[in-house]
From Swiss-Prot:
<feature type="binding site">
    <location>
        <position position="132"/>
    </location>
    <ligand>
        <name>Zn(2+)</name>
    </ligand>
</feature>
<feature type="active site" description="Proton donor">
    <location>
        <position position="99"/>
    </location>
</feature>
<dbReference type="GO" id="GO:0008270">
    <property type="term" value="F:zinc ion binding"/>
</dbReference>
<dbReference type="GO" id="GO:0005737">
    <property type="term" value="C:cytoplasm"/>
</dbReference>
<protein>
    <recommendedName>
        <fullName>Cytidine deaminase 2</fullName>
        <ecNumber>3.5.4.5</ecNumber>
    </recommendedName>
</protein>
<feature type="domain" description="CMP/dCMP-type deaminase 2">
    <location>
        <begin position="199"/>
        <end position="320"/>
    </location>
</feature>
<dbReference type="InterPro" id="IPR016193">
    <property type="entry name" value="Cytidine_deaminase-like"/>
</dbReference>
<dbReference type="Pfam" id="PF00383">
    <property type="entry name" value="dCMP_cyt_deam_1"/>
</dbReference>
<feature type="binding site">
    <location>
        <position position="135"/>
    </location>
    <ligand>
        <name>Zn(2+)</name>
    </ligand>
</feature>
<dbReference type="InterPro" id="IPR050202">
    <property type="entry name" value="Cyt/Deoxycyt_deaminase"/>
</dbReference>
<keyword id="KW-0378">Hydrolase</keyword>
<dbReference type="Pfam" id="PF08211">
    <property type="entry name" value="dCMP_cyt_deam_2"/>
</dbReference>
<dbReference type="GO" id="GO:0009972">
    <property type="term" value="P:cytidine deamination"/>
</dbReference>
<dbReference type="InterPro" id="IPR016192">
    <property type="entry name" value="APOBEC/CMP_deaminase_Zn-bd"/>
</dbReference>
<dbReference type="GO" id="GO:0004126">
    <property type="term" value="F:cytidine deaminase activity"/>
</dbReference>
<dbReference type="InterPro" id="IPR013171">
    <property type="entry name" value="Cyd/dCyd_deaminase_Zn-bd"/>
</dbReference>
<feature type="domain" description="CMP/dCMP-type deaminase 1">
    <location>
        <begin position="43"/>
        <end position="164"/>
    </location>
</feature>
Length: 337
């Protein structure tokens, strides 16, 4: 009988440790299911600001000292966070905007759209408004851009959503491809680099190739992907996301670093020990030099390798056969490279 209090105390300690561990994990959470978001107070889109402080705490702004958070809801019901990321020792044009982070987060989780967006424009996270012009361009290239709503909220007021189309209309030429649309670039590794295991092996260059096959590069046709490995053996990936306006484009290293920030639970960039870039040989836009500059600066002990790829004509033909839709008028739709 005398042991029961000790057993109860032990169980209470275990419960406390579990709760603390769960809270620590939640601290670095960038993706919320609808139920998880509801537990954070986001029961409908107008309450997206309830997650903004959590987002701002996750921002990495050692240079600008200005932490920005963004919270968005997809049609799946999941809620995503975006944060700004500066890279110590690098010019600010390499930085990632919070809205870019959020859209990349959506892409890495294979979401199809972004329905509602709240971006903090004050350091206290109480005021919400229009994204910067750079990010508006990025957002307008999504397939549902005309239906997307942006929260406008002065301090201590309820706020309301406005249509994105009113902020930046007609930025895409008719027939332009859209961000977040499913893509397969039909790439294969060139030469001896392709002689590795099977398509589902875990080699970092195979993961980088898979990322490159998801890359959105319809204007320069220079798809590329990056895979990273940290000191604990965890891997991350990202791909080049191109904008019709050029400058808002996000490189594959930055996209992979979005994945790293979102899933590494607070690790510093110097914990990245390996990186692989896969891109086309003689691509009109090469990522190699930029990737090396970024990784040499933020992860000086990282082993960086580059492998080249090319379009596999047999895969491309098979892909076209499987995805091409021909309507009764002979028009071709559903084709994305």
């Amino acid at each position: 009988m005398a042991q029961r209090p000790n057993l109860l105390s032990h169980l209470q300690d275990l419960v406390t440790k579990f709760k603390n561990m769960t809270m620590a994990q939640d601290r670095f959470k960038f993706v919320f299911t609808a139920n998880e978001a509801a537990l954070e107070g986001v029961t409908d889109p107008i309450r997206l600001p309830n997650l903004i402080r959590k987002a701002m705490c996750l921002a990495r702004a050692p240079i600008s000292k200005y932490k920005v958070g963004a919270v968005g809801r997809a049609s799946s019901g999941r809620v995503y966070l975006g944060v700004n990321v500066d890279f110590p020792g690098l010019p600010l044009h390499h930085s990632i905007h919070a809205e870019q982070f959020l859209v990349t987060n959506l892409a890495l989780n294979y979401e199809k759209d972004l329905c509602k967006l709240a971006v903090a424009i004050s350091t206290d996270g109480l005021e919400f408004g229009t994204p910067c012009g750079n990010c508006l361009q990025f957002l307008m290239e999504m397939s549902n851009a005309l239906d997307m709503k942006i929260l406008s909220k002065p301090k201590h007021e309820a706020g309301s959503f406005s249509s994105l189309r009113l902020l930046l209309p007609n930025v895409l030429p008719k027939g332009s491809p859209f961000l977040l649309e499913k893509r397969y670039n039909c790439l294969t590794l060139s030469g001896s680099a392709g002689e590795i295991c099977s398509l589902d092996c875990s080699h970092l260059k195979r993961r980088a190739l898979a990322a490159a096959n998801n890359s959105f590069s319809p204007y320069t046709e220079s798809p590329s992907g990056v895979a990273l490995l940290d000191n604990d053996g965890n891997w991350y990936r990202g791909w080049y996301i191109e904008s019709v306006a050029s400058n808002p484009s996000l490189g594959p290293v930055q996209a992979a670093l979005v994945d790293f920030v979102a899933r590494s639970r607070g690790k510093m960039f110097n914990k990245i020990v390996q990186a692989v870039l896969v891109e086309k040989n003689n691509a009109s836009v090469s990522q190699e030099r930029t990737a090396k500059i970024i990784l040499d600066t933020i992860a000086p002990n990282c082993d960086f390798k580059v492998f080249h790829c090319s379009v596999d004509c047999a895969k491309r033909l098979k892909y076209l056969r499987e995805t091409l839709v021909i309507d009764t008028l002979g028009d071709y739709t559903g084709l994305h490279y």
